[in-house]
Design a protein with these regions (language model features):
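Intrinsically disordered, low-complexity and often Lys/Arg-enriched segments
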Residues: 169-176
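Short, hydrophobic/π-rich interface segment
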Residues: 101-146
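A conserved beta-strand-loop-helix scaffold within acyl/acetyltransferase catalytic domains
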Residues: 1-106, 113-116, 146-169
Length: 176
């Protein structure tokens, strides 16, 4: 579903919630969550949300987030909106708090215009990555210089918007 309907495609998620059409059983919206990847002080991360392509499902994000909140009773939740295509309107509508903008991220593109994540090319992974493609790895070069020397181009996006939701007070108040 995510590969076909989300701009960034699929990413691993331990929690996947969806809205189904009661008549057809088809999925119209999905929201995925996992443990926070970058900040271990935050319990969960909202990883992906999307509707079926060419469909606008009114209230879907709110319904899926409420289902997650009821089932998992999170203490904190973070999400990242790519600034290339989001202004963060959904997060504001879901009562998230804007925390900050991140610096631009980078990625590589090969001669066939395939995008390569910077995560795949971290220095400790780079030798295996390049050798798996029958390319040359030079220990004395940086990640960037190794990639460019092997014909990749580097591109930058505009970074992310970081949104946060704190539930500690909300759930503690309802438990008393």
């Amino acid at each position: 579903f995510l590969w076909n309907n989300h701009l960034q495609g699929h990413c691993p998620a331990s929690i996947q919630l969806g809205l189904q059409d009661p008549k057809t059983g088809g999925i119209y919206s999905i929201m995925t969550f996992g443990k926070s990847r970058f900040d271990k002080n935050i319990e969960y991360e909202l990883l992906r949300f999307c509707n079926l392509r060419y469909h606008n499902v009114r209230g879907a994000a709110s319904k899926l987030l409420k289902a997650f909140e009821r089932a998992y009773k999170p203490q904190s939740l973070v999400s990242y909106a790519n600034r290339d295509w989001s202004q963060g309107n959904l997060y504001r509508a879901l009562d998230f708090t804007f925390i900050r903008s991140t610096p631009p991220n980078y990625f590589y593109v090969d001669s066939k215009l395939k995008t390569i994540s910077r995560i795949q090319t971290q220095k400790h992974k780079l030798k295996a990555f390049l050798e798996s493609k029958n390319l040359v790895f030079k220990e004395e070069l940086s990640e960037r210089d190794n990639m460019i020397g092997n014909g990749y181009r580097i591109y930058y996006d505009t970074g992310n918007l970081v949104y946060y939701k704190n539930y500690k007070r909300q759930f503690n108040d309802t438990n008393n």
